[in-house]
Amino acid sequence: MSQWFNQFYAAIAQSPLSHWLETLPAQLKHWQLEASHGDLPQWQKVLKNLPEVKTQHVDITSQVKIGTPGEMTDGEQKQTLHLLKRMMPWRKGPFSVHGIEIDTEWRSDWKWDRLLPHIEPLKGRTVLDIGCGSGYHLWRMRGEGAQFVVGIDPSDLFLCQFQAIKHFNPDENVHLLPLGVEALPELKAFDTVFSMGVLYHRRSPIDFLAQLKAQLRPGGELVLETLVIEGDENTVLVPTDRYAKMRNVWFIPSTAALKLWMERVGFKNVQIKDCAITTLDEQRKTAWMENESLVDFLDPNDTSKTIEGYPAPLRAILTAKA
């Protein structure tokens, strides 16, 4: 596991991110000590048992397709399928790994297709994805020509799922670090920062937006995707307890309110690029995610509402400049 992080340290040592090395190694060492008491050791065993295969065919431009069935023996493919299944649930994807189709809960490729026409080209950029899950979008960012891609997410499982994919496509310019946003110093070095599906989980959304801005170089672009509701700049939903069965949802603003928040913390040229209702085809139970999904979170008699009676999930994409 240390080699994952050592590779990252070496990659940033001579870059505008080098000052991150003042704090990052100690943070990750602390994480390793904490994580060793949970499920991480069993997932590390899964990773160690993945077969060594020379991957020749990779497509991360139109999808995340790593390898073809012919590059593995039948035995290796069965072994890989068994091991990847042990890392369930798989939430963000889909992935194709040497003919194994990982049909994830979310069709994250649909979100990517919605936002891609609206963002600045990623070619040659240094990119950060905050709350990146198991890293599906990291690969798509790299596929668009980003020079260096970093994702952060505090989940041990997401880290190991990412490393399982990277095992078959060992790209030294795509990395995932098991950190929350609160662990980031003011790096002010990224050309583009993505935050998708995180804002409503933060108790202080204004502080969170300021943290996002602090990661961008002057003139860099924020791509923000989050839950919103209909209304004017004074409209914000604060659930009394749960929203769509989630306890950790704190603030769901209207797009107008969110735009105002972003401007208050200093973002410029804030633009609302897309609004889309989350459909039952985009988020659903699959053979790779057998727990409850969106259909279980909505009112069975009126899918325009959550099971608690709030408006059903509506997701917006906004862009802004630091």
From Swiss-Prot:
Reactions catalysed: carboxy-S-adenosyl-L-methionine + 5-hydroxyuridine(34) in tRNA = 5-carboxymethoxyuridine(34) in tRNA + S-adenosyl-L-homocysteine + H(+)
Keyword list, A-Z: Transferase, tRNA processing
EC assignment: 2.5.1.-
Classification via Gene3D superfamilies: Vaccinia Virus protein VP39
Highest taxon of source: Bacteria
GO molecular function: methyltransferase activity; transferase activity, transferring alkyl or aryl (other than methyl) groups
Residues at which carboxy-S-adenosyl-L-methionine binds: 92, 106, 111, 131, 153-155, 181-182, 196, 200, 315
InterPro entries on file: CmoB (IPR010017), Mo5U34_MeTrfas-like (IPR027555), SAM-dependent_MTases_sf (IPR029063)
Principal EC category: transferase
Classification via HAMAP family: tRNA_carboxymethyltr_CmoB (MF_01590)
Function according to Swiss-Prot or TrEMBL: Catalyzes carboxymethyl transfer from carboxy-S-adenosyl-L-methionine (Cx-SAM) to 5-hydroxyuridine (ho5U) to form 5-carboxymethoxyuridine (cmo5U) at position 34 in tRNAs.
Protein name: tRNA U34 carboxymethyltransferase
Organism for this UniProt entry: Pseudoalteromonas translucida (strain TAC 125)
Gene from which the chain derives: cmoB
